[in-house]
């Protein structure tokens, strides 16, 4: 290890949960030395070598965790769908709402009509509660434009959010989210547009870090998704997939075939799907908010993910229809309560495994030397409290790239 004699800032006085290896890996009364935006030393304060720090910050107890990562959101969209919330409470299914012109398509209309500035202002409003909870990295998908102009518009807004606020934003092109109204009955023709026009242009403009698709009976078939993935490969972009949310189509196996960085939802994933994901290194992104709001009854196969050592990430799935959730902390509790995950698994799901689901595990997700100085200081005594408490207990301090975030 390189000897450290100087640093920009030294932080100590709290217990540190590093999440190395997906476990708490507690450092009692730890210390973190930072130079620039990187951690240059971390360990017990009692073992701190002689380091000259330009600035010292002393915490009075509490817990430090890695900055939270929300690895699956649809945060940029026009309007909301609160009327559909009422419909679902009256027994109308998600599929029925979509068949009657609601669902994703109603948001597509609103998103196409909105200006870039309007979308930006609405997204800023939605993003700020997540920042307040300690989210330091977020993924934002397109998928409500469904034509070249509007998909580009959404991705530009997502990139702009990362320029305006102290948060890392990863963007995903989800043009294969639903069939736009002008292509009803012509899904293959729309996939032509996605593959030959939208994905190449998004790649040219460097607006996306990955490509996603929705593999489901009410969206696109595995064969159509495979075409999207081939186009993404040609453009040099990694892939992700909404898979097995409402039915078993072996989408997760298809995702694994293309070494997708994640497959998401997965309520209907089979053992063979999970085996394929394990072999490919594909992360399972679980979305308890959508499960809860849709009042689903089939849980993702948590025991199979454990058995085959598939990393489990968690995310808000913030979107206007099926998961209008602006709290990643709430997802920790839901994952434990609804899916029977442990608090330790849940915290790994919004730190190290979420980083892996975005392909940023080399720089984020755990607290260790060489990684970004992103962390959250909580006024808590045990990490399980992050999943235990519903509401309240906002972070005392969020540090983003070595600086206290206002």
Swiss-Prot record:
SUPFAM superfamilies registered for this protein in UniProt: Composite domain of metallo-dependent hydrolases (SSF51338), Metallo-dependent hydrolases (SSF51556)
- Residues annotated as binding 4-imidazolone-5-propanoate: 81, 144, 177, 245, 322
Subcellular localization(s) per the UniProt record? Cytoplasm
Q: Name one GO cellular component term.
A: cytoplasm
Q: In which pathway does it act?
A: Amino-acid degradation; L-histidine degradation into L-glutamate; N-formimidoyl-L-glutamate from L-histidine: step 3/3
Q: Which reaction does it catalyse?
A: 4-imidazolone-5-propanoate + H2O = N-formimidoyl-L-glutamate
Identify the enzyme class. Answer: hydrolase
The record's cofactor note says: Binds 1 zinc or iron ion per subunit.
Transit peptide keyword on record = no
Family per similarity comment:
Belongs to the metallo-dependent hydrolases superfamily. HutI family.
Protein name, as recorded? Imidazolonepropionase
Question: Which species is this UniProt entry from?
Answer: Yersinia pestis
